[in-house]
Amino acid sequence: MEYISTRNSSKTFNFKEVFIKGLADDGGLFIPKSLNKFSEAEIDSFKKLSYQDLAKNIIFSFIGDFMSENDLSRIIDKSYSVFREKNVVKLIKVGDRSVLELFHGPTLAFKDVAMQLLGNFYEYYLNNENEKINIVVATSGDTGAAAIDAIKGKKNVNIFVLHPHNRVSSVQRKLMTTGKEQNVINIAINGNFDDCQNLVKSMFADKIFSNEIRMSGVNSINWARIIAQSVYYFYSYFLVEDKDRPLNFSVPTGNFGDVYAGYLAKKMGLPINKLVVATNQNDILHRAISKGSYEVEKVTETISPSMDIQIASNFERLIYDLNDCDDAKTINAMKDIREKGKYIIDQERLNKINTDFLSSKMSEEEVLETIKKVHEK
């Protein structure tokens, strides 16, 4: 499979380049040049597969030039052997709804599902290429902990984690800062997550620096994270017994990565009806999807710090789609966000968004009340 940047559709890359670079040199995000869509028969054949075997089928279609099918199979089995749940994730009923449990990995974060795989991808790559890599990652808490657990102790790779000082939970801080592995370096930044993320982006943008240190990234902009997360949309879809009604996925999201993985699954042929973007008070995605106003505001601290984000990096991939895969229009949109702090989505493009996405926003009080209500069911 060939890949392109959202800001330059004329230059192609293979998966190895996409994975190691993380971010394109032009600042854009990597996407497939063309996407293979599974047939109904193929999707039907996936129904009885274990999570691990399903992952092998889906992920190999994206990375075939990176490793053999046997190597991928071995790495997937190794990656998910550290999960407490045999099938990696678990679907439970809560009233008339189903909830997908994604917390069975080593750091209790949904990001373990992709991050454990990425850690072993790096190990495979470095063993074959005889190189050294420096991973730089921004985190609001759970990404850093999951990335550290996946990378710690591995040879020829260091991981530098930038987190906002006093803006991560106590558990997240301890998970990130109490290890003794020599290849893990934590840096607390005075600011919020967006400040950390902007520092990482600026390092990637400095081509001389990033090439000199062999810099790589594991934030949700890394395409490998997206394809790994798309697997559990397929798996959970097959577990839902009542499919007489259209199936919607409601996804808490800050950086638009996890819900974009659901969008990718839909584009691959999974019959998802709507993807509901659930936000806290930092509601830039809700405003974009419901009103067409992607306007950056001040970050509000909440009890869900992983969603305390005002610049949702993965939204650029959707902007590219909305503009009919026009890289020049995507560049202009990202320039508006960077220079004016906003991007206005016209009604035609908003209608396109709403064929796939809905959104909602909740206050702190509503979040706490909902947690209590669900817990008591």
Model-assigned labels for residue ranges:
Residues 1-377:
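PLP-dependent amino-acid enzyme catalytic core
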